[in-house]
Amino acid sequence: VPATFGYKVAVWIDELCRHVERLQGCEDRVFVAMLGGGAGTLASLGEVGLEIQDLMARKLDMKPMTMPARTTGDHLCEYVTVLGMLASTCSKIGGEVFTLMKQEFGEVEESVPPGTVGSSTMPQKRNPKLAQDIVAVAA
């Protein structure tokens, strides 16, 4: 069943918007000030440990850790996971554009800046350079 290019782009935009929502939704959990001393217990800072952590977090425009610790990394894992999902979507988009640029389909093409050629052997051809770059960078 055929689908228009506009429909494909709408699906991409919808998926990218969900990634933006995910990134915004995890900000308070991900960007936390990790302060706790050698063992992560704030013991070396005594009774003012939590207060110092809160002050440091405010200065860095971050949230303080709810439970200071050195061995937690779930906040970083969450961030990397969301970025991985975003990279996967970008790779998918680049791959689809790459395929749609093939001569068999010819549905889309990348613009070629004035004064340059699209291909070293066939000047009329448009190589999917940007689409390839997106796939490579997202990998």
Outline where the language-model segments fall.
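Internal glycine-rich alpha/beta core junctions
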Residues: A3-A139
